[in-house]
Structure formats: C-alpha cells, structure tokens
C-alpha cells in the first residue's frame, strides 16, 4: 500500500528522471587541448552523441590546465601523494539567450612514485578520472537547465 501511495505522489508531481533516455539537442563546441578532446567526447556521450552546430542548445566549455598539488611527503622530503585539479567554465545558450553560465571543478589524488613511467601512469589516470567527474557535473547541470527551460 505504501508503494502505491508513493507511486501516486510521484506521478502527481510530474516527476521526470533527469537521464530518462531523452536525447538532448546540445552542440558541444571544440575544447582546447587533449584533455579538452576527452571532455568533449564524454559530454557528447552524455547528450546522446555528436550534434550539429545548428542544434537548439550550444555549450561552450573552457578547460583550464591541470593544477597539481603535493599532499603527502616522506621524512626525506620527497612527495608521495599528489592531487590533480581541473576547472572548466561553461556557457549554455538557447540561440542567443544564455541560460546557464558557471564553472565546475573536480580533483583526484594519486600516488607519486620515483619511477617515471609509473608516476606518469598514475597522473594520467587521475586526469582521466577528473575529466569524467567534470563531465558528470557539467552534463547534470546542463540537462537540468534545459529541462527548466522547456518547462517554462
């Protein structure tokens, strides 16, 4: 009985899941750098694939260079733990009207070792994880703003 009441309450408030399978008509413009290519590909996959420049919504993203901070040190002073942080600012437009203008940041920690190959692999993995976090944050905000726009 409780489940039925909950179902009726959710249905009456016009609940609509954010990722309900609807394809969103968003063109994601090119983003500078290799990390930008990865971010653009990840965003395009969230929006149902690549869209043409004449799509209803246009998303312009600017991705800053990664910032690396030391987080842990050995007694000898060598760094053993680092954090990489990426920040992306974006503007979502419906034609010429700006409907969202914000920035998102994401960070990931990784082990920094003395071996160059292992250290580079850890760094690259942390950057990729950070890009996917940014993609999740930006796509969630964009889809929410689009749904608000279409419900007005």
Identify the function of each model-found stretch.
Residues 1-13:
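Sec-dependent bacterial lipoprotein signal peptides
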Residues 12-29:
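Bacterial Sec signal peptide processing site at the extreme N-terminus
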Residues 13, 26, 123-152:
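Compositionally biased, intrinsically disordered linkers/stalks adjacent to structured regions
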Residues 14-19, 34-38, 150-152:
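Flexible, low-complexity charged segments
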Residues 16-18, 49-50, 68-70, 145-148:
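Short beta-strands and strand-coil junctions in structured, solvent-facing domains, enriched
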Residues 25-32, 58-60:
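Short hydrophobic beta-strand segments
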Residues 31-46:
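N-terminal targeting signals for Sec/Tat export/insertion, comprising classic cleavable signal peptides
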Residues 45-46, 50-55, 60-103, 109-132, ...:
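Surface-exposed short loop/turn segments
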């Amino acid at each position: 009985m409780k489940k039925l009441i909950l179902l009726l309450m959710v249905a009456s408030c016009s609940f609509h899941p954010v990722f309900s399978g609807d394809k969103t008509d968003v063109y994601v413009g090119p983003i500078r750098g290799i990390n930008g290519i990865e971010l653009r590909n990840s965003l395009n996959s969230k929006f149902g694939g690549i869209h043409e420049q004449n799509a209803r919504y246009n998303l312009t993203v600017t991705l800053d260079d990664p910032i690396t901070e030391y987080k842990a040190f050995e007694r000898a002073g060598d760094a053993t733990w680092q954090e990489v942080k990426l920040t992306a600012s974006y503007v979502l437009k419906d034609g010429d009207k700006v409907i969202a203008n914000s920035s998102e940041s994401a960070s990931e920690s990784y082990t920094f070792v003395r071996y160059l190959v292992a250290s580079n692999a850890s760094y690259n993995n942390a950057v990729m994880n950070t890009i996917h976090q940014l993609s999740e944050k930006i796509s969630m905000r964009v889809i929410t703003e689009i749904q608000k726009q279409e419900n007005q």
